[in-house]
């Protein structure tokens, strides 16, 4: 038996989950937020308890020290050497990393170089990896890449219709993201349907603050909505999703607050989507509250959101030439029944129909009617478990 930590590090946060392996038992979980500020928050959940501390955490190394000390302080582990592996979620692995890998200096260097593809995510992941290697240098560290699952896409799918030199010289192509989530829920969907994954055609919709939709053919990703970066695809919480690229130079010319392309991309990443259109929030719960109040901006944001998701799902029905099931997962996918109802309401032509009583908050499983030709499933994603499994698989190959 061994203990493995799954880590999801952001620029100012560190989310973690401790597993007993190979039993896959969750021993504890938590998050450290606002790293770099004087009022950082560390939350630990274990044995039905919740401990929260306000601390001054300067960087990721200090955050890791606090996490490990808390594990001992709360009696979750007796000593550091009980931890035999740590797995790190990394958003962008480019073309280099087609599967999870054991970390070494070269791997870490490549992750930092690939920050250009995920500037909101890779730097934080690299900081988390460095922190664990500094404090626990003798345990196996594994990187699990969001992009790895999508390396099965065909060249005609991942290339953009621009001169090929931009791919050959600069590796401009579709990479996708959320691959660990899409892989996990596809496997769970096959179990739920009682059929081999290798026989299924699935559309998996990861709808959280970030949104990505994937066409899964016989267990492999054949297309996905996120692209060169996680900015592409349907409308998201704070991200615009797909827009006409000619808008970028136009806005630089017209708006004095947007001085260059970086300013526009920052606006598209952090100030757009549900938040930008509604002027209220990136949280669907707040948008739905606005719908109840007949707030016109909330209504508009919601309608754009539903429209873009329906179009993307419809597109992947064409890619797969039909589908056996549509899977909803992640924060909104799992917990926004109104959104699911309105998305499916625009896709009934494909043979989908949901049971209104099953499509309720908190329900997990098959929410379609017996007559529905395409099954509609709600499955809780578990990226952390996927990470822990890969650590267990790779820790003896160091």
UniProtKB/Swiss-Prot annotation:
It comes from the Bacteria. The keyword Phosphoprotein does not apply. Its cofactor is Mg(2+); Mn(2+). Substrate binds at residue 89. It catalyses: acetate + ATP = acetyl phosphate + ADP. GO terms for molecular function: acetate kinase activity; ATP binding; magnesium ion binding. ATP binds at residues 15, 206-210, 283-285, 331-335. Mg(2+). Can also accept Mn(2+). InterPro entries: Ac/propionate_kinase, Aliphatic_acid_kin_short-chain, Aliphatic_acid_kinase_CS, ATPase_NBD. The record marks 178, 239 as: Transition state stabilizer. It is an enzyme of class 2 (transferase). Its EC number is 2.7.2.1. Homodimer. Catalyzes the formation of acetyl phosphate from acetate and ATP. Can also catalyze the reverse reaction. HAMAP family: Acetate_kinase. Belongs to the acetokinase family. This is Acetate kinase. It comes from Streptococcus pyogenes serotype M6 (strain ATCC BAA-946 / MGAS10394). The gene is ackA.
């Amino acid at each position: 038996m061994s203990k493995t930590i799954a880590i999801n590090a952001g620029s100012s946060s560190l989310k973690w989950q401790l597993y007993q392996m190979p039993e896959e038992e969750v021993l504890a979980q938590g998050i450290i937020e606002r790293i770099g500020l004087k009022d950082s928050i560390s939350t630990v959940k274990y044995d039905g308890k919740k401990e929260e501390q306000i601390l001054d955490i300067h960087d990721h190394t200090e955050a890791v020290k606090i996490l490990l000390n808390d594990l001992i302080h709360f009696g979750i582990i007796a000593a550091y050497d009980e931890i035999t592996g740590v797995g790190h979620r990394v958003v962008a692995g480019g073309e280099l990393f087609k599967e999870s890998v054991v970390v070494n200096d070269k791997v870490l260097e490549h992750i930092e170089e690939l920050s250009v593809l995920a500037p909101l995510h890779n730097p934080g992941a690299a900081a988390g990896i460095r922190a664990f290697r500094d404090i626990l240098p003798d345990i196996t560290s594994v990187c699990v890449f969001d992009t790895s699952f999508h390396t099965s896409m065909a060249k005609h799918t991942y290339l953009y219709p621009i001169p090929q030199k931009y791919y050959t010289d600069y590796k401009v192509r579709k990479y996708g993201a959320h691959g660990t989530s899409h892989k996990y829920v596809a496997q769970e969907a096959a179990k739920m349907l009682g059929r081999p994954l290798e026989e299924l055609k699935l559309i998996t919709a990861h709808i959280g603050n970030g949104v990505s939709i994937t066409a899964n053919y016989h267990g492999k990703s054949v297309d996905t909505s996120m692209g060169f970066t996680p900015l592409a695809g349907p409308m998201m919480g704070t991200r615009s999703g797909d827009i006409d690229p000619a808008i970028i130079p136009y806005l630089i010319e017209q708006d004095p607050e947007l001085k260059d392309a970086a300013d526009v991309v920052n606006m598209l990443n952090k100030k757009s989507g549900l938040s930008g259109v509604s002027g209220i929030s990136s949280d669907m719960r707040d948008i739905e509250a606005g719908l109840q109040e007949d707030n016109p901006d909330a209504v508009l944001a919601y309608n754009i959101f539903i429209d873009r998701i329906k179009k993307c799902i419809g597109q992947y029905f064409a890619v797969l030439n039909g589908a056996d099931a549509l899977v909803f997962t992640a924060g909104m996918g799992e917990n926004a029944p109104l959104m699911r109802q309105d998305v499916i309401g625009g896709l009934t032509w494909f043979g989908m129909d949901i049971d209104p009583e099953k499509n309720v908050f908190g329900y997990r499983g098959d929410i379609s009617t017996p007559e529905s030709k395409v099954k509609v499933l709600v499955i809780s994603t578990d990226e952390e478990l996927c990470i822990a499994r890969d650590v267990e698989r790779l820790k003896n190959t160091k």
